[in-house]
Amino acid sequence: MSTSQTLGGATRCGRIIGPSLDKIIKNAAWRKHTYLVSSCKSVLDKLESLPDDFHDPSSVVSGLAASDADSVLQPFLLSLETAYSKVVEPSLDCAFKLFSLSILRGEIQSSKQDSILFKLVNAVSKVGAIAEEPIQLAVLRVLLAAVRSPCILIRGDCLLHVVKTCYNIYLGGLSGTTQICAKSVLAQMMLVIFTRSEEDSLDVSVKTIYVNELLTFTDKSVNEGSSVYFCQGFVNEVMAAGQGSPLPPPDVIQILLQNPETETVMTPDSPSFRGYVANGEGDSETGDMSKVRQDAFLLFKNLCKLSMRFSSKENNDDQIMVRGKTLSLELLKVIIDNGGSVWRTNESFINAVKQYLCLSLLKNSAVSIMSIFQLQCAIFMSLLSKLRSVLKAEIGIFFPMIVLRVLENVLQPSYLQKMTVLNLLDKMSQDPQLMVDIFVNYDCDVESSNILERIVNGLLKTALGPPTGSSTTLSPAQDSTFRNDSVKCLVNLAKAMGNWMDQQLKVNETVWPKGSQVYASMDSNASQISELEGTISDCDSQPDTSNPEAYDASMLEQRRAYKIELQKGISLFNRKPSKGVEFLISTKKIGSSPEEVASFLMKTAGLNGTVIGDYLGERDELPLKVMHAYVDSFNFEKKDFVEAIRFFLRGFRLPGEAQKIDRIMEKFAEHYWKCNPGSFTSADTAYVLAYSVIMLNTDAHNNMVKDKMTKADFVRNNRGIDDGKDLPEEYLGSLYDRVVKEEIRMNSDTLAPQNKQVNGLNKLLGLDGILNLVSWMQPDEKPHGANGRLIRDIQEQFQAKPEKSESVYHTVTDISILRFILEVSWGPMLAAFSVTIDQSDDRLATSLCLQGFRYAVHVTAVMGMQTQRDAFVTSMAKFTNLHCAADMKQKNVDAVKAIITIAIEDGNHLHGSWEHILTCLSRIEHLQLLGEVSPSEKRYVPTKKAEVDDKKALGFPNLKKRGSFQNPSVMAVVRGGSYDSTSLVKSVPKLVTPEQIKSFIANLNLLDQIGNFELNHVYANSQRLNSEAIVSFVKALCKVSMSELQSPTDPRVFSLTKLVETAHYNMNRIRLVWSRIWNVLSDFFVSVGLSENLSVAIFVMDSLRQLSMKFLEREELANYHFQHEFLRPFVVVMQKSSSAEIRELIVRCVSQMVLSRVSNVKSGWKNVFTVFTTAALDERKNIVLLAFETIEKIVRDHFHCIIETEITVYADCIRCLITFTNSKFEGDIGFNTIEFLRFCALKLEEGGLVLNEKLKNNTISALKEDFSDTQSFTDLDEQVSYWIPLLTGLCKQVSDPRPAIRKRSIEVLFHILMDHGHLFTRPFWTGIFSSIILPVFNNIRSKTDMLFEESVDSPSSASLDTEETTWDVETSTLALQLLVDLLVKFFRSVRSQLPSVVSIIVGFIKSPFQGSTGSGISVLLHLADGLARSASEDEWREIFLALKEAASLTFAGFMKVLRTMDDIEDVETLSGQSVNIGDLDDDSLHIMSYVVSRTKKHIDVLSQIVEVVSDLYRRNQFSLSASHVDILADIFSCIASHAQQLNTDTVLRRKFKRACSVQNLTEPQLLNFENEAYKSYMMFLQDMVTCNPNVSKELDLESRLVTECAKIVKIYLKCTDPQQQEQQQRKPVLWVLPMESDRVEEATARTSLLVSSLEALCSLEAESLKKHVSSFFPLLVDLVRTEHCSPQVPYVLSNVLKSCIGPILA
């Protein structure tokens, strides 16, 4: 025989088989195994002769022909059949190699039992029964290698047999190592088989099982030290042995995977493995699946059936059965854990899970073995993770059965079961999508239980522990474990929601903008919800899932709202059924018909069966109809009577009231007899029998009934009930037996628990409302065992669910769903975290709770749920215990750290919660400050000396001082208070004790864990907050700072300092955001700046200065107003502060800022000038002087910076300067300010000249001459507009009450106009006159007019010559002179204003005030001289018409004055007698004096008007046109006529004489006035006729002259001819002047006028005289016969007659 190196020949298989055969030959017993040895030798010889490259696809052995394959493997079959371990081992080793190296190939199944491979696998399986560990391990190796081989396909029953072999090795293993290896091999086989089914391929990559995971639930006791490591290496070796072996040709694989239609997967004659499972149903379940999937399906189904085996009654404690059940469940778990998409897409696999695995879980739910329960939970978790999308209905049923039943049992739970459930929930809570899907598909499903809500409430109950006073089986350690684990689950749930939310936001970051505003509550869809009318089934309409987002956003919310309202109705029904039905009908949850209400009662889950029974038994109309409809809905046809009753009563419990039972059972009997008319004689029989059955049921199953009813008693009680006849005794006995054996009862009882737990902490945290929702007693649920009726009911539910659209599984990615989840879970989370952290000092428990708080705040904050977010943050802030530092513990410090972490991580979404966080930071700093100066403490981080000084200056106590702890503010901190109380207690009833002080100081050590870095990090991190968050942060910080500063005894500036720092940190934000921030800061600085605490106010204003200096470093672009905003607090505080120190500080701050950053100031100028304007009116002189010094520097040195900005800034500057002129402090400020205004004008002119230099083809002279309407001059107009504020300000100063200021203002105003008017355009000049110049004179005119009106209305007290009026006249005269100079200088530009100026001058002329007339005349003459060559004819006409109007208005005003003397009695004077003064009262005397004075002034005014008219005529007589002359003639004429009117009023003259005589006054010269007026008129006419005959002829002035001469002669004749005197009746006179003397005096006065008129006639030409001789000749005759007082009259008269009349007559 050849050596071992050459055994087997050159073929690949030969090299493997040869050594094994040689070893068999050596180990075999020659006598006993002769045939085996000879067979081995024969094969060895054959192998050595075979070629190496032979290929036969039909052969099962690679490299051999099909005919040789069987003979080569035959020795191994013989060796295995010997069961002799020495020859079995080499055979198994060779088989392992052949399978591992893919030498063997082909399909192995029971239908091909002649196949050598089938025989080989079967033989290997048989030797597994050998009770030797090496043999069993070798068998496991071979079977695993066969299953793993990509060239071998073990099918059907053969595969089951392989599994059974490993199964039996596990059950009968001699050692723990063997058992673990068997389990590991089985698990690895499951991976191989089901991985192939996933990919539908033989050659797949399969992961190696992890042995330690298989020992999680079972077999921990059989682990023998290094067994796990050995088994892991064992499996690894088998799996690695086949790697690298060549693959079979594709045609071989195709043959193996082919699934002929005629091939049968399962055969009736299955091996003994079928003893463990039921017979298969055939291949109808597998359909057209491939072979590998058919095998996987078969294996899965049989494993499920194996897991449903239960112990027999004879052997309840069958350990083998239990281990087999457990192993099958473990293998099912491995399969589900490693399942892929095929389980969610292949209907056969889905149905297999539903029909077999779910049934297995259902039947095992009542098993009390812990390992099985744990495996159930693990499989259930796998189903949730992998297959929840296809098992919606099943999961909805298993949740209460497996999880909630245990979770909600608080009082008497099984420790291990509950720990298993808590571990399951812990895993679930770590899968965010799973929790979301549970909520969406169950809590939002009308047909499903609120699973997530029950989970969180169950976790809350567990976290709170058993209620106080209740009995429990838990030890304190177990209870503590439950509490911690339940809290951990809630923490993980909050974390999972946050992670899911963050993930969705990251995925949809292009769709969802950041910020909590995204998660604002969705619009209500009430109109859509209202469509969900009718019964619950109406909700089962299939939603449109073509648009998932639409479903998520709208339909989900509708369904959730619908379910909540439905549950509200169900809850109301369980308390008050009638109101509940009424509510459900009104909200359209059910229809109003009895049939619909009955259907609702029958089908709706959650209704209390007892309440249903009570409602159905009511005798009211609707409940009675509903009861009838309820009963009629049952179909009792061909139903046994007891089963009918049982079926009828499964939905409700019969009421306790006999009448209600009677009504219900009467209707039941009637309906039963109607469905089964042949069952009894009448319905009465059914009624009586039903009543008897109900009583029997109560008697048999009520423990309180001691003497039970016998069958004989029952038969006897029902004699003669069938219409007098007896029912068959056998029938009644059968009824008795069935009722006694199985109780008639409801399917389930839903009793509402009543026990609730409330403690002081709940009240503190406001958790009463949350905890009141928690039921502490476990619902009285029906035991979920493996009884047939329960299984049938659940299977009916399984089958019914898919028919409803609610069974559609929804996967939601819309984060808005988190709002609904949080609404359900936030309350239990808050309660659990709060109660735990308050009651427990365990570091692990409190750390968990704080993590939960962090996660909950994150989710609620990002989702924009303000109420929930604030609740969590507030609770955390309370748990810091900073408000009661004497009781602080480590957990409170941890809470502080958590709050700081929240502030850093979720600052963007905290919004209103920032106030609580910043309050905590403030309190920390307060406590640290106290600790830093306490006797036993040193500073944690050295504070700057300045900072300490500031704090001490603001009232902080020094604890080192003796008795400092009895300081009221320190006592308040030591004694503590509620979270919302202030740190100061105004009245402390007693001193703090040394123990309290010691505890307080000791607790301050805990705060050393929180350094300044942690505190400052929150404020420094503010620069990373988004735009909305930083505004909220600043608002909150302002509130906290305000509360610090408002403390009356220990105000602090910590938050104020941090506010300033925060502003510095965020200074680089965009202006839009900064504007919003500053709106908050501005109001805060104003509030604090107005504080009564001077130190605080100074500190905040200095802080504001620092910020403003920073702001001014940033350049501001044009048309922005940010500087204006951040300087506004200075203005407000300056205007409102009552503290002179603050106002002075503001002035200094603003001065420093402006002068140091003057080039950067833009929009801030407005506030700067507003501050100085306010300072200008301050009561403190030093403030006024300080502000004026600054404004002086600004104007003098930086005027260009002002005019570079917008016009309003310059206007503010001028307004500020004007205000300084109004300062009440006398001195040079006012005058200096006015001079500065003139300086501003010079600066503006410089700006105008610069602009003019830019104009093309224009010069300064051209600008002075005229302005054209080109675009260049548009720019000039804009520049000129800067003059408006300056001129307007000076205009206002004209009305200043101080004469010197007023006069200087007028001078400067007009000097500016004179010096710089060449820059102004005509439109601008028009504006200057209308807005500035004319108002100056209007103001003066209004004053004089007012005084004049007062004097007219009350002449007795009037005085026109007061000092004020005198000054007004002087001022107005000066202004008038300057105005005329201005008009003359710029007449070309302002000639349109000539009428206005003339009107002003005329007003002066006609003014009754002393000196104004003369001033007006001189000014008018100056104007005439200045405009002599410039004014046009029309402009002269305007001047003359104004003079005429002035004269006319003078007449009217004077006549009004004269009417004031109408009430004074008129008496004729008698010569030689005195006047009795006593006849006149004081008012009359004053009136008379006033009128006399006014008459004199009136005469003077008119005389000067005549004079100015004459003067104007003389200066311009040759340039006057006819219209001008006509106006002048009218002026002379009207004045002369007025003078005659006054002089001829004898009554007036007598009154004047009387008044002047009484008061020793000179009489008004009325006569002289008349003579002078006529004389001027005559001279004017005579000169015109003589010198300007053309105009005279055009106006017929000669006729006027003759007429006026005739009038003068008549007047003279009237006073000299007695016959022409009218005789008047007079009253008695006191004294009488002789008439001759009076006439002589008047005639003498009129002589000169008469002579002038006669001479004027003589000057006429002969033709003119001849034409008018007829009119004046009679008057000459009268003059001849009149006695004259002067010889001149006859002389002139004779001359007229001789030289003029004579020639005419001749």
Swiss-Prot record:
PROSITE patterns: SEC7. Residues 555-742 form the SEC7 domain. Transmembrane segments: none annotated. It is a peripheral membrane protein. SMART domains: Sec7 (SM00222). It is found in: Cytoplasm, Cytosol; Membrane. CDD domains: Sec7. GO terms for molecular function: guanyl-nucleotide exchange factor activity. The active site is at residue 657. Keywords: Cytoplasm, Guanine-nucleotide releasing factor, Membrane, Protein transport, Transport. GO terms for cellular component: cytosol; trans-Golgi network membrane. SUPFAM superfamilies: ARM repeat (SSF48371), Sec7 domain (SSF48425). Homodimer. Activates the ARF proteins by exchanging bound GDP for free GTP. Plays a role in vesicular protein sorting. This is Brefeldin A-inhibited guanine nucleotide-exchange protein 4. It comes from Arabidopsis thaliana. The gene is BIG4.
